From Swiss-Prot:
InterPro entries: MetalPrtase_cat_dom_sf_prd, YbeY. HAMAP family: Endoribonucl_YbeY. It comes from Porphyromonas gingivalis (strain ATCC 33277 / DSM 20709 / CIP 103683 / JCM 12257 / NCTC 11834 / 2561). This is Endoribonuclease YbeY. Belongs to the endoribonuclease YbeY family.
């Protein structure tokens, strides 16, 4: 049974429209022949994600998302840590709305759980294309002026 959880550590939990985000994630997973199992998002600050990156991945840098894959066969399961600090700073640097960048990061982790990679230039280009396709799906679902966040 599909279950998507949202938690926060050191930040306020974004006001996610849970039903819509759940439907969107399920649609994206379905495109890759996957079903949603249990997915947990932990929204955090830069310091929290840096410590997790150091402890679990032996990386000494900040990042917007860390994805821990617990997938089984064709069922998507995993834990995703998202630094809202980095999402916010990336949105400013890219001249994007915060909400749009958050949507991209939310689905980026799901795409990793569906098997996409982003370590090589070719893989990164495929990931970006998949993110864009997923964001179009989102816009078709909720309308171009709406957001996954409650305002």
């Amino acid at each position: 049974m599909a279950k998507i959880n949202f938690y926060a550590e050191g930040v306020s939990l974004p006001r996610i429209r849970r039903r819509i985000v759940g439907k969107w994630i399920a649609e994206v997973c379905s495109r890759y022949g996957k079903a949603v199992g249990e997915i947990s998002y932990l929204f955090c600050d830069d310091e929290y994600i840096l410590k997790a990156n150091q402890e679990f991945l032996d990386h000494d840098y900040y990042t917007d998302i860390i994805t821990f894959d617990s997938c089984e066969a064709d069922t998507v399961n995993g834990d995703l840590l998202i630094s809202l600090d980095t999402v916010r700073s990336n949105a400013r640097a890219l001249d994007l709305r915060y909400e749009d960048e958050l949507h991209r990061v939310i689905i980026h982790g799901i795409l990793h759980l569906c098997g996409l990679k982003d370590k090589s230039k070719k893989d990164e280009a495929q990931m970006r294309a998949a993110e864009e396709e997923a964001l179009v799906m989102l816009q078709e679902t909720i309308g171009s002026e709406l957001s996954l966040l409650h305002t």
